[in-house]
């Protein structure tokens, strides 16, 4: 997509490809993989994940293994409304939520959530990296650069500007500690579950996090993995409710942007996912260290060629 992508400076060979959700993305990707004898592909964005998982069988027939579950599982987990609905039907506890079809339903659900006394959350059913996420509440700090709140009346004004009603999910606000959990599974059987406490985030990604032991979080994630039948790497995000229960609010059925933190903790989940994909064995158990991650920006300088 970008000729000056910073990642080009950290790899042996690079290509500019179409957007992950474009019609010819997978055909271009397959051609590149065959040309370079690539046998594993790692989707790193939702658009790429959906396109690649949809054509997974075609890749596999050519000896190219995508690190992801099948398309039906991927879509059901990625689409926030379907994900919450599916887990609720399987008796997995989830936050209170609603999939509104019009403005009037939003007003009704806001009252049920206890608004304006209690805030609630609104987000697109399909989006990544925190895009479109808002906390609906009456009071907010205007001078906070990370302010992601919106008043109900302003939310309604925004939605009324669209010709077609947006597909959104309304969800109860979870006030407790937040966890991003990287997991590795094999045909629905959890192999590794590594909770990481999200201490500080910038937009969607964590910039301060801590790999910790949390049995309640691990137990909930294990149930979710088995219910969906995830295969290989997945990331599951949870937050504690007011009743002190960790509840899932988002699932990324792919590697996460912060998977590197697990390597620092002693478990290289990305490497293990690749090994499983190509039929190699991985350690059944590896001790994990608690570790804190601080993320920062670094520059790459490109000198003009004379």
Predicted regions and their residues:
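ATP-binding N-terminal substructure of ATP-dependent carboxylate-amine bond-forming enzymes
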Residues: 1-68, 107
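ATP-dependent carboxylate activation and anion-phosphoryl transfer catalytic cores
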Residues: 15, 202-203, 213-306
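Active-site nucleotide/adenylate-binding loops and adjacent lid/helix of ATP-dependent enzymes
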Residues: 74-168
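Phosphate-binding site of ATP-dependent enzymes
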Residues: 146-206, 210-228, 239-247
């Amino acid at each position: 997509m970008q000729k000056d992508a910073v990642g080009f400076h950290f790899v042996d060979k690079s290509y500019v490809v179409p957007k992950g959700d474009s019609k010819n993305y997978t055909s271009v990707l397959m051609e590149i993989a065959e040309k370079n004898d690539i046998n594993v592909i790692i989707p790193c964005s939702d658009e790429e994940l959906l396109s690649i998982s949809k054509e997974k069988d075609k890749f596999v027939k050519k000896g190219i293994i995508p690190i992801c579950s099948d398309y039906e599982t991927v879509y059901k987990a990625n689409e926030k409304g379907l994900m919450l609905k599916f887990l609720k039907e399987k008796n997995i506890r989830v936050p209170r939520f609603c999939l509104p079809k019009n403005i009037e339903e939003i007003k009704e659900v806001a009252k049920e959530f206890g608004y304006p006394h209690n805030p609630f959350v609104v987000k697109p059913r399909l989006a990544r990296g925190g895009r479109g996420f808002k906390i609906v509440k009456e009071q907010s700090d205007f001078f906070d650069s990370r302010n992601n709140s919106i008043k109900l009346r302003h939310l309604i004004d925004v939605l009324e500007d669209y010709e077609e009603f947006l597909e959104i999910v309304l969800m109860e606000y979870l006030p407790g500690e937040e966890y991003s959990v990287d997991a590795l599974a094999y045909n629905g059987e959890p192999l590794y579950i590594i909770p990481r406490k999200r201490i500080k985030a910038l937009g969607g990604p964590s910039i301060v996090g801590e790999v910790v032991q949390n049995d309640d979080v691990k137990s909930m994630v294990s149930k979710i993995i088995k219910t969906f039948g995830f295969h290989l790497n997945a990331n599951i995000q949870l937050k504690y409710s007011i009743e002190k229960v960790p509840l899932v609010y988002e699932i990324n059925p792919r590697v996460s942007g912060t998977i590197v933190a697990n390597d620092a903790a002693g478990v290289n989940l990305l490497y293990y996912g690749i090994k499983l994909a190509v039929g190699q064995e991985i350690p059944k158990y590896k001790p994990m260290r608690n570790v804190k991650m601080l993320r920062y920006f670094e520059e790459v300088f490109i000198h003009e060629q004379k």
